[in-house]
């Protein structure tokens, strides 16, 4: 049996679940818990695409798109695995940031490394604490 171990809310003692959230440029609605395939958007590009080394993505299980909790990943772009116009990550996962410096360090990270600090360079006004 698969058991997730994400962020446990100290007030409820329950695992936090964050929905898949994707937005398309010029579209009024934000889409939640639906992949591009679910929506029939086979050629769309999200507002924040997985298009470059260091794209920061939110993780969820393969079984559900609404069970993200506390895990994320850095997209390590490889042209042969992600040919132009055929990025299968877009619309299945949500990007929420980009690494802008330190790519040499990024490529050396392992799952056992610890992030000590992060600086938000733009967009802090959009942060919703305890949302």
Predicted features and spans:
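Cross-family detector of peptidyl-prolyl cis-trans isomerase
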Residues: 2-131
């Amino acid at each position: 049996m698969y058991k997730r171990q994400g962020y446990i809310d100290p007030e409820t003692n329950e695992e936090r679940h964050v929905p898949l959230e994707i937005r398309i440029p010029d579209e009024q609605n934000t889409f939640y818990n639906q992949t591009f395939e679910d929506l029939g958007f086979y050629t769309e590009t999200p507002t924040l695409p997985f298009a470059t080394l260091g794209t920061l993505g939110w993780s969820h299980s393969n079984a559900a798109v609404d069970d993200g909790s506390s895990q994320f990943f850095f997209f390590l772009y490889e042209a042969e695995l992600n040919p132009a116009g055929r990025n299968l990550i877009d619309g299945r996962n949500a990007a929420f940031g980009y690494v802008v410096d330190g790519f040499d360090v990024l490529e050396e990270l392992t799952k056992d490394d610890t992030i000590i600090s992060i600086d938000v360079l733009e967009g802090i006004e959009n942060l919703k604490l305890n949302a």
